[in-house]
C-alpha cells in the first residue's frame, strides 16, 4: 500500500460537513468525505476492503476549504500527478484536488498537524448580497473596527477557551494556543476578513470568537470582554455564533518533517 497526501478545496454550501454520516452503515447525507471515499475507491477498482479517506479537519455544514488535507492508502504506486488528475475526473465540481504527494506510512492528516489557519469573511452591506450569502457571514449593524483591532490581542497565547466551545465539543481539554489573530479591512468590497492561526481549534470556536468580536465592534461588549470570557469558562456568556457560510479552512501546517 502507498500512502498519499492530498490538498483539497471545496465549496461547502451543498455539503453536510466533511465527515461521513451513516445510519445502519448507509450514508444519509452528502458529505465531502463521502464523495472523496467514492472517488478513491472507484480509482482503486473497488477493493474488497474499502479505502477510507482521512481528513485533517472535520468542517461543519456550510464551511468551505481552500486547504483541507487528507490522506489515503492505494493498493498500487503511481505518480501523484496521475492520482490528482484521476480523482478530479471522478469528483463533483464542488470539490477540487489541488495537489497530491506521496508520504510515509506514519503520516496522518489529522494527528500530524502542527498548526491550522482559518479565515472568516464578513459582509457589511446594508442588505444581504445574494451572490455572497453562501460565502460570507452578514453583519449590517454599525461596527467600530478600531475596537475590534484593540480586542484581538486578547486571544493570543495559550488559554482555556471553554467559553468559546459549542456544546457539541468532544475534546478532553479546551486549552488551545492561538498564535495570530488579525482583522483585514476591505472597505471597497464592504467586507471584513478575520484570520486566525493556532495549534488547533475547538468545535465552533472560530465562529464564536467572530461573534464576540463583532459584538465588541458594535459596542454591545466592552473592548476587553474576551479576557472576562476566558476567565469565566461559560459558553452561555459568549452568546452569538457567526454563521458557517463565512468560515474557510485556509491552510494546514505539518512542520519541518520532510515525510509530511
From Swiss-Prot:
EC category: isomerase
Keywords linked to the UniProt accession: Isomerase, tRNA processing
UniProt: substrate binding residues: 118
Transmembrane domains' residue ranges: none
Catalytic activity: uridine(38/39/40) in tRNA = pseudouridine(38/39/40) in tRNA
EC number: 5.4.99.12
Keyword Membrane among UniProt keywords: no
Active site (UniProt): 60
Database matches in Pfam families: PseudoU_synth_1
Cited InterPro entries: PsdUridine_synth_cat_dom_sf, PsdUridine_synth_TruA, PsdUridine_synth_TruA_a/b_dom, PsdUridine_synth_TruA_C, TruA/RsuA/RluB/E/F_N
Recorded GO MF terms: RNA binding; tRNA pseudouridine(38-40) synthase activity
GO biological process, one term: tRNA pseudouridine synthesis
Family of the protein in this entry: Belongs to the tRNA pseudouridine synthase TruA family.
Function noted in UniProt: Formation of pseudouridine at positions 38, 39 and 40 in the anticodon stem and loop of transfer RNAs.
The protein's assembly and partners: Homodimer.
Protein name in UniProt: tRNA pseudouridine synthase A
Amino acid at each position: 500500500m502507498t500512502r498519499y497526501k492530498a490538498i483539497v478545496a471545496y465549496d461547502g454550501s451543498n455539503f453536510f460537513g466533511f465527515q461521513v454520516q451513516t445510519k445502519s452503515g448507509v450514508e444519509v447525507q452528502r458529505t465531502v468525505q463521502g464523495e472523496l471515499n467514492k472517488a478513491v475507491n472507484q480509482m482503486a477498482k473497488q477493493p474488497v476492503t474499502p479505502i477510507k479517506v482521512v481528513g485533517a479537519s472535520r468542517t461543519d455544514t456550510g464551511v468551505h476549504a481552500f486547504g483541507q488535507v487528507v490522506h489515503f492508502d492505494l493498493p498500487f504506486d503511481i505518480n501523484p500527478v496521475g492520482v490528482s488528475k484521476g480523482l478530479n475526473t471522478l469528483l463533483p465540481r464542488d470539490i477540487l484536488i489541488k495537489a497530491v504527494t506521496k508520504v510515509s506510512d506514519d503520516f496522518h492528516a489529522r494527528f500530524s498537524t502542527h498548526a491550522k489557519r482559518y479565515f472568516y469573511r464578513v459582509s457589511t452591506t446594508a442588505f444581504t448580497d445574494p451572490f455572497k450569502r453562501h460565502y460570507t457571514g452578514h453583519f449590517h449593524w454599525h461596527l467600530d473596527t478600531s475596537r475590534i483591532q484593540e480586542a484581538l490581542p486578547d486571544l493570543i497565547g495559550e488559554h482555556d477557551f471553554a467559553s468559546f466551545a459549542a456544546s457539541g465539543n468532544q475534546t478532553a481539554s479546551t486549552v488551545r494556543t492561538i498564535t495570530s489573530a488579525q482583522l483585514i479591512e476591505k472597505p471597497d468590497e464592504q467586507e471584513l476578513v478575520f484570520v486566525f492561526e493556532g495549534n488547533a481549534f475547538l468545535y465552533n470556536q472560530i465562529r464564536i470568537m467572530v461573534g464576540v468580536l463583532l459584538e465588541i465592534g458594535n459596542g454591545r461588549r466592552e473592548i476587553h470582554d474576551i479576557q472576562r470570557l476566558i476567565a469565566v469558562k461559560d459558553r452561555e456568556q459568549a452568546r452569538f455564533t457567526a454563521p458557517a457560510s463565512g468560515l474557510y479552512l485556509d491552510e494546514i501546517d505539518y512542520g519541518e518533517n520532510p515525510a509530511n
